[in-house]
């Protein structure tokens, strides 16, 4: 047992940790990465030991701000460190690593210990990896989904008909929600849209919306906004909705994996938590996205529908084209700018963006009874073209604490590089993965001003020297890295009519 004085450390390690001077560890039974219980007069918290020579002095224990808040202690106060019990879920994680089926108790224990931070990031990574490799059956996924939802707040609504649109993502520039949500809200449909931040893409819906307004809102604020406007566009993590999901996502993000069991549970847990009764789920299909072909997409759609039945949520899925970015803008600020331009002048907006936004909104207009079957997309267009969607979008921005902006008022990265066509020809391919990696290298989504603007898309004719796309960044160093990557991976491919000259057999 160790008695040490707490010292505040302004550091975010993504998990609970205590930083101990290596001299205090000598001759004890405590070692780096040991799990310990930190106790004070006000409570206790579990963390893993990290050793240091200089960050804290002998007799001190470095504690992260989240831990200090969790047990309500002051800097300099004495705390006690003792060995914590091994998490109950460790054998269950090993069981899943061996490809075995987990029972409800085992699944609930894993999720509970994720939320209570009894599992280290290494242990959580092992669980995520095991589901990525070995998968889960529908009973396991259903149990995991319910427990993830139960770990946080549960929002209830006065109205019975509450709907939602969700995309599983993977498509760069997937900003459709900034059009679809205000279209539906303007039609009187209740649609409280909660989104995650980017996992595998350069910008999630929450990242894009955050360029324009506050997305970290509490439950009472969301209910007030939805009562006033019929809709919202907020970050689910700001509302304590399914907090286990956000912890899992933070482990998935560095390695850009999104295991299908977690994907299903993540999406549907948020639906349970936000009181959704009807949901349309967009499954992009194509090269460079999560789902490679229509057969895979149909299989995943059936799983969403089956899971929805287990959870008493009506789910309808749509397979959409994901073979190239949606619209021309990729990255938070650029996508926000393009979305506003589309709301202001839909006739001159990218057709792919308009078509997807109208199609998804149209389905829910029909499910919600605002339009007859087959007429939803027409009604969605009327709302968009009339300016009602823009008016509703600005109302949502104001209610969430922002100020409506004109497209030209949105700030982009100061460091810019244009990539030009090397030959005359046609754009024959746009590599989603390459585009995503280039934009991430430029700094997105953390750097909201970082992004990429496409001048040409697949099938467009270009001349040598034409600008294919422009990379933006808030950092000169990040821009150089992004440009170097772009020149290695060629995310936009141009080919001439002459493919190869053959003169010998």
UniProtKB/Swiss-Prot annotation:
GO terms for cellular component: cytosol. SUPFAM superfamilies: Nucleoside phosphorylase/phosphoribosyltransferase catalytic domain, Nucleoside phosphorylase/phosphoribosyltransferase N-terminal domain, Pyrimidine nucleoside phosphorylase C-terminal domain. GO terms for molecular function: 1,4-alpha-oligoglucan phosphorylase activity; AMP binding; pentosyltransferase activity. It comes from the Archaea. GO terms for biological process: AMP catabolic process; pyrimidine deoxyribonucleoside metabolic process; pyrimidine nucleobase metabolic process. It catalyses: AMP + phosphate = alpha-D-ribose 1,5-bisphosphate + adenine; CMP + phosphate = cytosine + alpha-D-ribose 1,5-bisphosphate; UMP + phosphate = alpha-D-ribose 1,5-bisphosphate + uracil. Catalyzes the conversion of AMP and phosphate to adenine and ribose 1,5-bisphosphate (R15P). Exhibits phosphorylase activity toward CMP and UMP in addition to AMP. Functions in an archaeal AMP degradation pathway, together with R15P isomerase and RubisCO. Belongs to the thymidine/pyrimidine-nucleoside phosphorylase family. Type 2 subfamily. This is AMP phosphorylase. It comes from Methanococcus maripaludis (strain DSM 14266 / JCM 13030 / NBRC 101832 / S2 / LL).
């Amino acid at each position: 047992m160790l008695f040490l004085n707490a010292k505040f450390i302004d550091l975010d390690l993504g998990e609970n940790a205590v930083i101990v001077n290596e001299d205090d560890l000598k001759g004890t039974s405590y070692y780096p990465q040991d799990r310990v219980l930190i106790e004070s007069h006000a409570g206790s918290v579990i963390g893993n030991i990290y050793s240091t020579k200089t960050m804290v002095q002998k007799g001190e224990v470095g504690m992260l701000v989240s831990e200090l808040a969790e047990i309500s202690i002051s800097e300099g106060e004495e705390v006690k460190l003792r060995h914590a019990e091994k998490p109950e879920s460790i054998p269950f994680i090993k069981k899943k690593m061996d490809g075995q089926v987990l029972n409800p108790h085992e699944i609930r224990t894993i999720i509970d210990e994720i939320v209570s931070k009894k599992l280290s990031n290494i242990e959580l990574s092992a669980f995520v990896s095991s589901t990525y490799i070995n998968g889960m059956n529908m009973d396991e996924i259903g149990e995991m989904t319910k427990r993830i939802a139960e770990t946080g707040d549960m929002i209830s609504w006065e109205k019975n008909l509450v709907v939602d649109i969700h995309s599983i993502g993977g498509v760069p520039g997937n900003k459709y929600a900034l059009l679809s949500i205000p279209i539906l809200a303007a039609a009187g449909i209740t649609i409280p849209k909660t989104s995650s931040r980017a996992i595998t893409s350069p910008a999630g819906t929450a990242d894009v919306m955050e360029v324009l307004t506050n997305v970290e809102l509490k439950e009472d604020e969301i209910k007030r906004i939805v009562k006033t406007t019929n809709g919202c566009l907020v970050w689910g993590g700001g509302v304590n909705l399914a907090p286990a999901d956000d912890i899992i996502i933070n482990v998935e993000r560095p390695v850009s994996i999104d295991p299908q069991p977690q994907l299903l549970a993540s999406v549907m847990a948020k639906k349970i938590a936000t009181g959704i009764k009807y949901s349309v789920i967009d499954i992009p299909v194509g090269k460079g996205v999560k789902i490679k072909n229509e057969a895979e997409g149909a299989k995943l759609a059936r799983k969403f529908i089956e899971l929805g039945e287990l959870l008493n949520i009506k789910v309808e899925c749509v397979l959409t084209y994901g073979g190239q970015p949606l619209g021309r803008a990729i990255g938070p600020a650029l996508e926000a700018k393009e979305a506003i331009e589309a709301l202001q002048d839909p006739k001159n907006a990218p057709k792919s963006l308009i078509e997807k936004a109208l199609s998804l909104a149209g389905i829910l207009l029909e499910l919600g009874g605002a339009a007859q079957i087959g007429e939803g997309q027409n009604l969605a267009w009327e709302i968009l073209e009339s300016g009602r969607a823009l008016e509703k979008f600005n109302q949502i921005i104001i209610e969430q604490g922002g100020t409506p902006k004109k497209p030209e008022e949105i700030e982009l990265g100061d460091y810019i590089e244009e990539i030009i066509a090397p030959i005359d020809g046609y754009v024959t391919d746009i590599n989603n993965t390459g585009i995503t990696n280039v934009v991430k290298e430029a700094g997105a989504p953390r750097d909201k001003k970082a992004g990429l603007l496409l001048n040409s898309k697949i099938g467009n004719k270009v001349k040598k020297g034409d600008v294919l796309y422009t990379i933006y960044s808030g950092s000169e160093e990040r821009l150089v890295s992004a440009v170097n990557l772009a020149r290695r991976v060629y995310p936009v491919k141009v080919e001439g009519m002459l493919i190869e000259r053959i003169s010998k057999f």
